[in-house]
């Protein structure tokens, strides 16, 4: 096993309460998608360092473990983290296929070491992330990825800090908001929800991370 994968709790401790919480999250999202299937999902946060990338990595793992083909896309073109979490290269990725038709036909997806889970890292960081998210090309990229997987998950920058997440949220089936207990200021969380509502994004739920549940429970929830 890739040593980095041991840092992903749903892989290293699949029977832990934390891993069970991620499976519960997966199930809740399935129910949220009864009216409209969540083929594409954006995961964002109100502010920085709130655990969105870790949350998304674990959600992707448990979704793949349920027998679905999952593509995890690092659309945080400012501070990409997913390639580090999985211990993979970031030389090519989302920005590569945004610029290259040949790459779009054969996306540089990387095997994560988890069956049925692939990562499309951010690739080289561009000077204009928000413009790329808003482009027609991004819609073509999403369509191409959906053809290759049962579900496509996107990691994005915090929705309050920059416009990238809000722009991408208008192009997907749903948005999951990550909030850190004891860190996210209430007004930031409120602003994040308001921004998503203003653009008519489909907010399917929120995840509270870094909750202290006592000595018998190590977890994010």
Which role fits each region the language model picked out?
Residues 1-8, 190-221:
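Hydrophobic micro-sites
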Residues 1-28, 210:
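Acidic-aromatic/histidine active-site loop/patch
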């Amino acid at each position: 096993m890739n040593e980095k994968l041991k840092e992903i709790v749903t892989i290293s401790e699949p029977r832990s309460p934390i891993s069970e919480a991620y499976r519960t999250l997966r199930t809740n999202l399935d129910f949220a998608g009864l009216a409209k299937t969540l083929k594409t999902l954006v995961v964002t946060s109100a502010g920085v360092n709130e655990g969105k990338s870790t949350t998304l990595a674990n959600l992707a793992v448990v979704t793949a473990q349920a027998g679905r083909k999952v593509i995890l896309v690092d659309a945080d073109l400012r501070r990409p983290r997913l390639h580090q979490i999985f211990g993979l290269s970031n030389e090519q990725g989302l920005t590569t296929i945004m610029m290259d038709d040949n790459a779009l036909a054969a996306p540089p997806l990387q095997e994560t070491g988890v069956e049925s889970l692939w990562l499309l890292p951010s690739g080289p960081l561009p000077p204009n992330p928000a413009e790329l998210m808003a482009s027609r090309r991004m819609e073509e990229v999403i369509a191409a990825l959906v053809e290759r997987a049962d579900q496509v998950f996107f990691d994005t920058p915090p929705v309050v800090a920059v416009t990238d997440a809000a722009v991408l949220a208008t192009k997907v089936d749903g948005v999951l908001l990550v909030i850190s207990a004891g860190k996210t200021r209430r007004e930031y969380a409120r602003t994040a929800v308001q921004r998503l509502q203003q653009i008519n994004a489909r907010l399917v739920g929120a995840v509270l991370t870094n909750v202290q549940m006592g000595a018998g429970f190590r977890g994010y929830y």
